[in-house]
Amino acid sequence: MQLSDFSFELPDELIARYPLETRSASRLLHLDAKGQYHDHMFTDIIDLFEEGDLLVLNDTKVMKARLKGKRATGGAIEILVERMLNHTTAYCHIKASNSPKAGAELFVGEDNIPVIVRGRHENLFVVEFSQPILPVLEQYGQLPIPPYFNREAEEIDTERYQTVFHNPEKIASVAAPTASLHFDEELLAKLDQKGVKKTFVTLHVGAGTFMPVRTDDITNHVMHSEWCDVPQETIDLILATKARGNKVIAVGTTATRALESAAQAHGGKIAAWTGDTQIFIYPGYEFCIVDRLITNFHLPESTLLMLVSALSNRENILAAYEHAVKDRYRFFSYGDAMLIDKLEV
């Protein structure tokens, strides 16, 4: 399967660079189990879900992971904290005119907090902070909004690039689980009143989510690694949902990857799991847990577009995307949403 199989034309003006005034005011394109698409508003999910269905949400929180700083010589640098190893050490991306060497001292924030580059780990730098990382990020960091916004983070992003249900103890992502950004408290309450249940997994989203596929044959692509947790409580609810004949609805590709990673770790069995995942889902993959997926519209030739193409199929997804472009849906992180049903065989 070739990378070019997942290409489509997207006018730049359809990229949503700011959120709508109301989270749940987005549009929704439903791709059903027969491969037919239907236009809705996002709040119509109340009618598209059944009592007893289960929503699986990713409760991670986005860090203010981007730090501006300088070298000892005064040259500008930028650090993006990818993964914290402990309170003071992290794997980081560093933008600089020249790559810093092991032992280099850098300074971040307005108060010039010292950090030291300790070495490399694959394509990342191992960076030791002189103070605990999270307070430094909270005081001096910026939210790492996606590069396709083509702007700096603003005050509106502080609220709107986080989910309303994030767990403040789970602050470790460098990108939001964006399908969840459509849910506000009112919509969640209405789903609860209908009897739609909800549960949580955790997947800390890494910057690799924005990395392009660079191999013509997509099967040669190596996925980035992300930490996830699928707890026993969630597994119990999934098993009960399937026993009732109801649907498991993953909210976002991150929740999907967490659930399917847990299943793959147990040979396809539905069971709890915690660990690092590099799962790459593309057409031909057999889903073990996910029946339906809520997701945003994704970049051409991205691994996320490949994932959604595995749940329906590539032709159906690209036809739905073509319709979305013609009908002026809003794309990417702050854009509109899709509800995709697993294709009936």
From Swiss-Prot:
A Gene Ontology molecular function term of the record: S-adenosylmethionine:tRNA ribosyltransferase-isomerase activity
Record keywords: Cytoplasm, Queuosine biosynthesis, S-adenosyl-L-methionine, Transferase
A GO biological-process term: queuosine biosynthetic process
Entry EC number(s): 2.4.99.17
Top-level division of the source organism's lineage: Bacteria
One GO CC term on file: cytoplasm
Family annotation (Pfam families): Queuosine_synth
Catalytic activity: 7-aminomethyl-7-carbaguanosine(34) in tRNA + S-adenosyl-L-methionine = epoxyqueuosine(34) in tRNA + adenine + L-methionine + 2 H(+)
Positions of transmembrane segments: none
Subunit and partners: Monomer.
Family, similarity comment: Belongs to the QueA family.
PANTHER family xrefs: S-ADENOSYLMETHIONINE:TRNA RIBOSYLTRANSFERASE-ISOMERASE (PTHR30307:SF0)
Function: Transfers and isomerizes the ribose moiety from AdoMet to the 7-aminomethyl group of 7-deazaguanine (preQ1-tRNA) to give epoxyqueuosine (oQ-tRNA).
NCBIfam families recorded: PRK00147.1, queA
Protein name: S-adenosylmethionine:tRNA ribosyltransferase-isomerase
Organism annotation: Acinetobacter baumannii (strain ACICU)
